[in-house]
Amino acid sequence: MVVGAIPFDARRPGVLYRPVRVVVEQAPSPGAVVAPTGRLDVIGQSPDPDGYRRIVRKAVTAIRSGAMDKVVLGRCATVEVSHASEVWRPEDVLARLRASNPDAYVFRLDLDGGMGGLFDEPGILLGASPELVLSCSDSRIWTLPLAGTIARGTDPASDIRAARALLSSGKDLAEHAHVSRAVVEALGRHVDDIEMPSGPQLVATPVVWHLGTPIEGVLREGRSPLELLYDLHPTPAVCGWPSTPARDFIARCEGFDRGLFAGLIGWMDVNGDCEWALVLRAGVLHADRATMFAGAGIVAASDPASELRETATKMMTFTSALGELVDPPVIGLQIPDPPTANAVGRPTPAASRRPH
């Protein structure tokens, strides 16, 4: 078995381990998790909010000219804390992530550094990913591409309105169609008996609604799950479509090296059974600071301010495990209280919640 992470640029070396011992057990209930009381100071952003809006406008121009259909643009924020040192205990941050995101793929990976950019120093990668790229068991595969996002409401009525708005949003439905179509094309080169719903479903996290399409099938005889994984990655959910111009645009304009952000994290055994999720809703923890990442899918109808707010909303998954930011422009909005009820319902596609 190997466990670890593969970078966004899969041509680069990953962080993979062959464990001496593997323990598989039900994750313990997080119980009562004390909220952090420290205040976080912003010490860096790449790009800053104004810069992010500029590159979104540039991307929209490129898309409307026919250079590509979609590109996912990310940004990073680095924060430090001068009080409440318990915020930086990785086990506490992990417990908060698990408590707040019980349906996510919650992960921790200790890093030795030396990867350059944001991952050049030793640190701890932590996150709560909502997105399954590939799960395989006895040649049956599952995937759950997500694209199209809206912030959750702060009360049941506004939460219902948000969910309905997402399901009827032409911009988000078009963005999701690019992703699901590309995933199905990749699966078709490796998989038979593909099954999927006729349209996207709502997938909930504590802070956002996503559009998701659960897809499953049977791995073709003689095909490798690893080959399929590398054919899928990076999906248009974190890169864009077509992949080559989107990747080139990201390299030219985003302004930082993603490293493991928007990469893959998971495991694979000797039989090819595996489970790999995207490195999203994540950050790297150091002794005195943390760096988090979020991105948004840009299409022809994208509005720069709305896309900035989307990255802000997504960062809230990680910031809520650390503390509240002092500088609101970093995340773009204050952290709201979660909805007290979910009247719409919370679809949990089999692709994302298959038991092992």
Can you describe what each PLM-predicted range is?
Residues V3-I6, V71, Y105-L109, R258-G266:
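A short glycine-rich, hydrophobically flanked beta-strand micro-motif that places a catalytic Asp/Glu
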Residues M1-P28:
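Glycine-rich, N-terminal phosphate-binding loop and its surrounding beta-alpha-beta segment
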Residues R21-D50, R54-R57, C76-S85, W142-R252, ...:
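Contiguous alpha-helical scaffold segments within structured protein domains
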Residues C239-P245, F249-H356:
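Glycine-rich, small/acidic residue-mixed loop/short-helix segments
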Residues R75, E80-A174, H178, R189-E195, ...:
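An anion-binding catalytic pocket shared by soluble metabolic enzymes
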